[in-house]
């Protein structure tokens, strides 16, 4: 409504007023993807001259980005972790002069490449926007900024969000994936499993609970399969989270199959201790 639109305009006005990127250049590697396009718009609002280095980008823009990359003030990799790791390995021979950062959802495959690039003299940061490319209002969104040991590079990324209403969360680089196994892997897998368990034919009546879960699951299963597979498969902590989900479902099934009303009540009580109160 009006409040949402007002806050959105205020965010953009604050970014332009701050003019953080005025006179600076930024290259987004993988900028033709949906999140890459979001980053280019975001950086442009900050005053940066920003362009995409991506095979799917128009030739003129791609050429500009290719030429700008070695001396650009900021280089953000909006590519899958494996592709970003490969780029970092290539750049160790001649690191970009500006701050290099990734937005990967999984950090484990990047830890060694980040260290190698730093050893080669690069300034490297790492962050993770906890929202998708359709996000307009950042007030209810989180951005995780990982500590790479380079305070200057990390500060550059933090300043990008200072003029917005986003909530910045700092995490050690090595802790990121352990936490994301709960925040992403568990949540996504639960939504996917719910979608797969739905009947083939729709019922004429729906509960508010079903509607809420259907809406959540519908959003998840329409995201990029490749990205969501990487979130599960490349995170070394994912399987432990998924085993917890399987164990929890088994406990529910066991309580019902054994007609254990007290056990079922205990499950709901335990669930209340793990979820926010209303």
Regions flagged by a language model, labelled:
Residues 1-27, 32, 44-49:
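N-terminal hydrophobic or amphipathic helices and topogenic motifs
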Residues 37-38, 44-63:
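NAD(P)-binding Rossmann-fold cofactor-contacting core
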Residues 33-34, 82:
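Residue-level detector of alpha-helix initiation sites
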Residues 66-70, 74-117:
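Rossmann-fold NAD(P) dinucleotide-binding segment
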Residues 32, 55-56, 149:
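Residues in the short beta-alpha loop(s) of Rossmann-like NAD(P)-binding domains
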Residues 170-278:
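An accessory alpha-helical subdomain
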Residues 28-29, 77, 145:
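Hydrophobic Val/Ile/Leu positions in short beta-strands of Rossmann-like dinucleotide-binding domains
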Residues 106-167, 171, 177-180:
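Rossmann-fold dinucleotide-binding core
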